[in-house]
Amino acid sequence: MTKIQVLEIFSMVLSAGKSQKYSISFDYDTEFNELNVFLYCCEDSGSIDVVDYAISSQLSLDELFDKLREWTSIIAKDRKLQERKKK
């Protein structure tokens, strides 16, 4: 499995989730020949913030999986916080 396939699957999982609050985007930097990946958070107010980013060409596949696990943890913590606020 290639890095781009892993990122595309992660993106599909995010878009299929209950909340469309988080998304990722890819940006290929032709000057440096690097694939940049950004994790975005879309707030209720309409603002879109960059939560984190990675330069996937500088990461091994294992390191990329670690980064995606880290992002999943960020999203899960935020969802738990939002659920507590609703109660």
What are these regions (language model features)?
Residues 35-41:
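Short linear proline/tyrosine/threonine-rich motifs used for host-factor recruitment
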